[in-house]
């Protein structure tokens, strides 16, 4: 499943394609959304927002399209008139004079009015977004030490969107390696230095991934500016201590870690 950085980059691409342009055609696959098609013709997308792994497409008439890609959903940007060759099932089409955005395969799609943005079950439950520039390490530390989260193992906590939105498995793995902790640790058992390091890593690593993953530094042998230190690297030596990276399963997801420096 795409994690926060990937969802945010998708939102950036959608915004760049159609933001501010009048919609010339709108189509929804689901019957409950059909009535909104005519309401959106002539309107425009004002901005595309992310809340963790959910995407909110805001329109100029105050409607908002909520979509969650889950495992299979994917957005595509095409030139208007182009019909991609794909076996995926089209769910949403938002067309302007020159660009069209298409949502395939997703099933969690709703149209929301302004008052519903605060009452929608997922949006109401989700925690602060790690890519929100206003979210600080101090706030993250407060959440880590709150009665709700302080006694939970990181294996599950770092996948819980109610704790921090936008984290997922590769970020969980990379963050815990960065701070030298395991999935079995809990916030209540950490010292001040460990808490501080974790609070910073929970924001810095997702933001670095968003800003640089997929970009290339030609002066570096490994190429990509963001690269995995342990994720999908079982059997390889840890670059920090030289021990062999291992793979196990935690909270029903693959977990990669270094037994030499994560303890």
From Swiss-Prot:
Its EC number is 3.2.2.-, 4.2.99.18. This is Endonuclease 8. InterPro entries: DNA_glyclase/AP_lyase_DNA-bd, DNA_glyclase_Znf_dom_DNA_BS, EcNei-like_N, Endonuclease-VIII, FPG_cat, MutM-like_N-ter, Ribosomal_uS13-like_H2TH, Znf_DNA_glyclase/AP_lyase. It catalyses: 2'-deoxyribonucleotide-(2'-deoxyribose 5'-phosphate)-2'-deoxyribonucleotide-DNA = a 3'-end 2'-deoxyribonucleotide-(2,3-dehydro-2,3-deoxyribose 5'-phosphate)-DNA + a 5'-end 5'-phospho-2'-deoxyribonucleoside-DNA + H(+). A zinc finger (FPG-type) spans 229-263. PROSITE patterns: FPG_CAT, ZF_FPG_1, ZF_FPG_2. The active site is at residues 2-3, 53, 253. CDD domains: EcNei-like_N (cd08965). DNA binds at residues 70, 125, 169. One of its GO terms (molecular function) is oxidized pyrimidine nucleobase lesion DNA N-glycosylase activity. Its cofactor is Zn(2+). It comes from Escherichia coli O9:H4 (strain HS). Involved in base excision repair of DNA damaged by oxidation or by mutagenic agents. Acts as a DNA glycosylase that recognizes and removes damaged bases. Has a preference for oxidized pyrimidines, such as thymine glycol, 5,6-dihydrouracil and 5,6-dihydrothymine. Has AP (apurinic/apyrimidinic) lyase activity and introduces nicks in the DNA strand. Cleaves the DNA backbone by beta-delta elimination to generate a single-strand break at the site of the removed base with both 3'- and 5'-phosphates. SMART domains: Fapy_DNA_glyco (SM00898), H2TH (SM01232). Keywords: DNA damage, DNA repair, DNA-binding, Glycosidase, Hydrolase, Lyase, Metal-binding, Multifunctional enzyme, Zinc, Zinc-finger. Belongs to the FPG family. HAMAP family: Endonuclease_8. One of its GO terms (biological process) is base-excision repair. Binds 1 zinc ion per subunit. NCBIfam families: PRK10445.1. SUPFAM superfamilies: Glucocorticoid receptor-like (DNA-binding domain), N-terminal domain of MutM-like DNA repair proteins, S13-like H2TH domain.
């Amino acid at each position: 499943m795409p994690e926060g950085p990937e969802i945010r980059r998708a939102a950036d691409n959608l915004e760049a394609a159609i933001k501010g342009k009048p919609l010339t055609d709108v189509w929804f696959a689901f019957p409950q959304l059909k009535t909104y098609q005519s309401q959106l013709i002539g309107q425009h997308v004002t901005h595309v927002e992310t809340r963790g792994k959910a995407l909110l497409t805001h329109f100029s008439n105050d409607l908002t399209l909520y979509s969650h890609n889950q495992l299979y959903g994917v957005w595509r940007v095409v030139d208007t008139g182009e019909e991609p060759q794909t076996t995926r099932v089209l769910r949403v089409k938002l067309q302007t004079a020159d660009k069209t955005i298409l949502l395939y395969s997703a099933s969690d799609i709703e149209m929301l009015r302004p008052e519903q943005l605060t009452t929608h079950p997922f949006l109401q439950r989700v925690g602060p977004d790690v890519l929100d520039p206003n979210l600080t390490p101090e706030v993250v530390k407060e959440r880590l030490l709150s009665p709700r989260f302080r006694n939970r193992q990181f294996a599950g906590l770092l996948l819980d969107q109610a704790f921090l939105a936008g984290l997922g498995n590769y970020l969980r793995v990379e963050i815990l390696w960065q701070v030298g902790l395991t999935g079995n640790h809990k916030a209540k058992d950490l010292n001040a230095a460990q808490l501080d390091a974790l609070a910073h890593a929970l924001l810095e690593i997702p933001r670095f991934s968003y800003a640089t993953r997929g970009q290339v530094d030609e002066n570096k042998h490994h190429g990509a500016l963001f690269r995995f230190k342990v994720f999908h690297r079982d059997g390889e030596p840890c670059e920090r201590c030289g021990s062999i990276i291992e793979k196990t399963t935690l909270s029903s997801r693959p977990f990669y870690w270094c037994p030499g420096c994560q303890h």
